[in-house]
């Protein structure tokens, strides 16, 4: 693709394109942002039914995952206040953090979508083989009859790490064979965790988008393979969107008002864009124009920003404009956005901020030092959106801000210590600037 043709197709001005290619921290405000939910094939009823399905599975989940006993099989994370960071950054409204780093089973936001799609497939296979939704107990799915049935199938997915963990752990627990296709960005501890749970891992010396393509071909060759498509799955999206109903209940219990006068501004890390888009969509269903979603991406991997700003969405990769894709944010290391992100977020996403790796580590150090919150580096980038919000006139002083932490509790202690030693050092320097 020539530079002239590229510029014409991208419909981006020269300075904006130059800033992207020079890895500048920028903010893109979505010119199509609006409040009306269009008529889409994933809608309010889809998400309502997804929440009810997860409730039906709760007794089973409680019986197989000890970390869900407290919540009686509901896989959800807490919300907490961050008063020390609020003071440091002089945030006018309330500051909260959504602790998806503490999500049961796989310790990340991917527990929402990945586990949900595996459960959907398990339910489908069980029903086709005599399971009665109205009469049978979901705990019966632990029986040999169903485990042998599930073991005839292999579930496959491509992942940089966290989605692979959620799909692999849920699939293997039910009795499915699981194969996780991982790009070169995947970290060793995530690979080892999967292997320890009997999950097959294929590692590609290639980027995420090409790993997805390879995984898709692998699955198509096997009639007993079920492929979970991180670039286009509506079931994954629905699983992420269940967060909206849960967050509404949590905020109500905390007596936090969400309204046009007191909007909720949510800062979500974005890689391929599926999980933040699903969460944002679910929040929009609950709060409409009283919620303002903002994504945050690495300066070296602004895939959703490039896709949405250009209008090309899934049809363009950061590599097409010469961006190198090199980032320590392994969970966000995706060069091409999902097919769903641009479509469902076209008028639902307020904007996207980009963040340098150095600032990302500073925010991780900030969370550790000031709030004693331990997350993996990519889970901390929402703070960049929070800082950017001070320059956004549409966000009033009365807003409630929510940084969405996307992963961290599964990180081995020695790995986390290495992350945090570096992060706190960078934060100490960052703070004095």
Curated annotation (Swiss-Prot):
Pfam name, any one: PALP
Coiled coil region boundaries: none
Superkingdom of origin: Bacteria
Catalytic activity, as annotated: D-serine = pyruvate + NH4(+)
EC category: lyase
GO molecular function ontology, one term from the record: D-serine ammonia-lyase activity
Keywords of the record: Lyase, Pyridoxal phosphate
GO BP annotations, alphabetical order: D-serine catabolic process; isoleucine biosynthetic process
N6-(pyridoxal phosphate)lysine modification, residue list: 110
CDD domains tied to this protein: D-Ser-dehyd (cd06447)
Known EC number: 4.3.1.18
Named cofactor requirement(s): pyridoxal 5'-phosphate
InterPro entries noted in UniProt: D_Ser_am_lyase, Ser/Thr_Dehydratase, Ser/Thr_deHydtase_PyrdxlP-BS, TrpB-like_PALP, TrpB-like_PALP_sf
Matching HAMAP family: D_Ser_dehydrat
PANTHER family named among the record's database cross-references: D-SERINE DEHYDRATASE, THREONINE DEHYDRATASE, MITOCHONDRIAL-RELATED
Family: Belongs to the serine/threonine dehydratase family. DsdA subfamily.
Name recorded for this polypeptide: Probable D-serine dehydratase
């Amino acid at each position: 693709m020539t530079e002239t043709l590229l510029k014409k197709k991208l419909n981006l001005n020269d300075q904006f394109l130059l800033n992207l290619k020079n890895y500048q921290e920028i903010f893109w405000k979505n010119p199509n942002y609006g409040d009306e939910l269009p008529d889409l094939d994933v809608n309010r009823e889809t998400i309502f039914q997804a929440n009810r399905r997860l409730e039906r599975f709760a007794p089973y989940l409680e019986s197989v995952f000890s970390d869900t006993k407290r919540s009686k099989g509901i896989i959800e994370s807490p919300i907490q206040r961050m008063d020390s960071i609020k003071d440091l950054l002089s945030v006018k409204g309330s500051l909260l953090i959504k602790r998806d780093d503490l999500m049961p089973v796989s310790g990340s936001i991917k527990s929402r979508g990945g586990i949900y799609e595996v459960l959907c497939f398990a339910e489908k296979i069980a029903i086709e083989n005599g399971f009665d939704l109205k009469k049978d107990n979901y705990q019966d799915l632990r029986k040999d009859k169903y485990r042998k049935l599930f073991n005839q199938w292999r579930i496959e997915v491509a992942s940089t790490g966290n989605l692979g963990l959620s799909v692999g752990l849920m699939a293997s627990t039910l009795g499915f064979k699981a194969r996780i296709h991982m790009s070169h960005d995947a970290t060793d501890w995530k690979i080892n965790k999967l292997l320890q749970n009997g999950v097959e891992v294929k590692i590609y010396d290639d980027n995420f988008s090409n790993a997805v393509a390879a995984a898709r071909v692998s699955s198509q060759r096997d009639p007993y393979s079920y492929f979970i498509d991180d670039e286009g799955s509506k079931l994954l999206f629905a699983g992420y969107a269940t967060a909206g109903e849960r967050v509404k209940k949590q905020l109500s219990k905390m007596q936090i008002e969400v309204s046009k006068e007191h909007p909720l501004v949510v800062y979500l890390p974005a890689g391929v864009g599926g999980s933040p888009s699903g969460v944002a969509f679910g929040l929009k269903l609950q709060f409409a124009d009283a919620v303002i979603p903002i994504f945050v991406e690495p300066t070296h991997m602004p895939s959703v920003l490039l896709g949405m700003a250009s209008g090309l969405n899934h049809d363009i990769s950061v590599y097409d404009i010469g961006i190198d894709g090199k980032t320590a944010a392994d969970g966000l290391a995706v060069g091409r956005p999902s097919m769903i992100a641009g479509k469902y977020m076209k008028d639902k996403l307020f904007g996207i901020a980009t963040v340098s790796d150095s600032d990302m580590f500073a925010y991780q150090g900030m969370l550790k030092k000031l709030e004693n919150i331990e997350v993996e580096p990519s889970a901390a980038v929402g703070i960049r959106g929070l800082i950017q919000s001070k320059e956004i006139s549409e966000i009033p002083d009365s807003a409630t801000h929510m940084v969405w932490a996307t992963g961290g509790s599964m990180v081995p202690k020695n790995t986390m210590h290495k992350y945090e030693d570096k992060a706190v050092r960078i934060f100490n320097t960052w703070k004095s600037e």
